Swiss-Prot record:
It comes from the Eukaryota. Keywords: Aminopeptidase, Cytoplasm, Hydrolase, Protease. PANTHER family: 2-SUCCINYL-6-HYDROXY-2,4-CYCLOHEXADIENE-1-CARBOXYLATE SYNTHASE, PROLYL AMINOPEPTIDASE. Pathway: Secondary metabolite biosynthesis. It holds the Pfam family Abhydrolase_1. InterPro entries: AB_hydrolase_1 (IPR000073), AB_hydrolase_fold (IPR029058), Peptidase_S33 (IPR002410), Serine_prot/Carboxylest_S33 (IPR051601). It is found in: Cytoplasm. This is Proline iminopeptidase aneH. Belongs to the peptidase S33 family. Gene3D superfamilies: alpha/beta hydrolase. GO terms for biological process: proteolysis. The active site is at residues 164, 397, 425. It comes from Aspergillus aculeatus (strain ATCC 16872 / CBS 172.66 / WB 5094). Homooligomer.
Length: 448
């Protein structure tokens, strides 16, 4: 994988700007870029972004740009002021661009219906292969070239702020277009540079196991509650507005276990669900809504590309299914001492219990069997990297393997980590007042 250069500037469709509270000015941008940057005649993707900066009396075009890469995969950006870390960035004098990565938010969003427009299942699967980190990065580069089209080459670099999967994209960016970047900040640990999810997901199951132990130690009364709920769901077909509440789907609430406050959130759902069964012998609408709106599996890109986001020349092969089957602690057997929740994982049965995913099961099968995934990282370039990379890393991270992240850190020159055993994966949001000063201390201070 060579360092890339030949990306054409994005085409600006329109831009609208508005003044808001705190002397902030936001702009909404729409761009057009090729679906395939190496073959521009194969179609286009529309990108949506919001930018924000502090107004200093005039609209100062000299403020340095910082790109934000959202976690996921498959999540669009929130509105800028919803990000807890943003004030510390604005205070440093950056102008921040929140880009909905291709297929998310308002950037040619991928849904079951929009995918169906592509034709048969193979065509849908082939399209989705264009929606991984490598092409997200090429889109970013096209947008950067538009923003800096009138700037001298030595003044056309920008910075990157990234979280979670956005950090995967950021490391790809460093390896593909190092001459475009000033610096990179990542919350959520360095990405695992692996070839297939089988190198990652068993490690994440191990963290999920530890989080289950913490959960039941804090809320031992939930052992019986969860068993009663699972028994009820086995014996009754419970309809949701967009699918069916199967025992496995309830078990997937565990995706929250690795977040700050996640254990308490799950306890609240369990307590409320059991209370419904105790009082009414059925689940009430507010409880069902609460369960249905938890997690991310209804997100099409997340469900279809969560395992392929690791793949480089190898197939994913439903790795999470294999891990769950191999570990009896994640069984739904009520004779187990405890019924454990699963963590961040995509299982094949999700394509039966989520309405948005039902028609996509054949697409998911094609992607799971596919091995023709391109390279996501230029490791030779990363080994000689000159772009400063600053990373906030949680030891007990249920979504990005700490061990594999540290291995990545050892392979990327000029990458510095601040490692903390009291942070979880979302600390850049929930503990921004700790994480952001720590990240900037890596940049502005020195250890020796």
């Amino acid at each position: 994988m060579a360092v890339e250069q030949n990306i054409a500037p994005a085409k600006l469709i329109d831009r609208f700007s508005h003044d808001g509270p705190g002397k902030c000015r936001t702009s909404e941008w729409r761009f057009e870029v090729p679906l395939n940057h190496s073959k521009p005649d194969e179609g286009t993707v529309r990108l949506f972004a919001r930018s924000i900066h502090c107004v200093l009396g005039v609209d100062d075009p000299e403020l340095p740009w910082m790109l934000y890469l959202q976690g996921g995969p498959g999540l669009g950006c929130k509105t800028p002021l919803e990000y807890a870390w943003l004030p510390s960035i604005l205070e440093k004098g950056y102008r921040v661009l929140f880009l909905d990565e291709r297929g998310t938010g308002q950037s040619s969003p991928i849904t079951a219906k929009t995918l169906a427009q592509q034709g048969d299942h193979k065509k849908q699967a082939d399209l989705l292969k264009r929606f991984r980190a490598d092409n997200i990065v090429r889109d970013c580069e096209a947008v950067r070239k538009h923003l800096y089209q009138d700037a001298p080459a030595d003044q056309s670099k920008w910075s990157v702020m990234a979280a979670s999967f956005g950090g995967f994209c950021a490391i790809s960016y460093v390896s593909m277009f190092p001459n475009s970047l000033v610096e990179v900040f990542i919350g959520g640990g360095p990405c695992p540079m692996v070839n297939e999810p089988g190198q990652v997901i068993p490690r994440l199951f191990a963290v999920a196991a530890r989080r289950n132990e913490v959960y039941y130690k804090k809320y031992p009364e939930d052992v019986g509650r969860v068993k009663r709920i699972i028994k009820y769901l086995k014996e009754n077909k419970v309809a949701l507005s967009k699918g069916t509440l199967t025992p496995e789907r309830f078990q997937q609430l565990g995706v929250m276990l690795g977040l700050h406050g996640g254990i308490d959130y799950i306890h609240g759902v369990v307590q409320r669900t059991d209370n419904d069964l105790d009082m009414f012998k059925f689940l009430t609408a507010p409880t069902l809504d609460l369960i249905e709106n938890s997690g991310m599996a209804h997100n099409v890109i997340y469900s279809l590309l969560q395992e392929p986001m690791y793949c480089q020349g190898k197939a994913g092969g439903w790795c999470a299914d294999k891990c769950r089957k191999a570990d009896p602690r994640f069984s739904l057997n009520e004779r187990n001492a405890q019924i454990w929740f699963t963590g961040e994982a995509i299982f094949s049965d999700m394509f039966e219990s989520y309405d948005e995913l039902k028609d996509l099961k054949p697409v998911a099968e094609l992607l799971a069997r596919s091995s023709d995934w391109g390279q996501l990282y230029n490791e030779a370039q990363l080994a000689r990297n000159e772009v400063p990379v600053y990373v906030a890393t949680a030891v007990e991270d249920m979504y990005v393997s700490y061990d594999l992240g540290c291995h990545t850190a050892s392979k990327v020159k000029n990458l510095q980590q601040v490692v903390n055993n009291t942070w979880y994966h979302d600390a850049v949001e929930t503990k921004a007042s700790e994480v952001m000063p720590a990240l900037f201390a890596l940049k502005e201070d020195r250890i020796d």
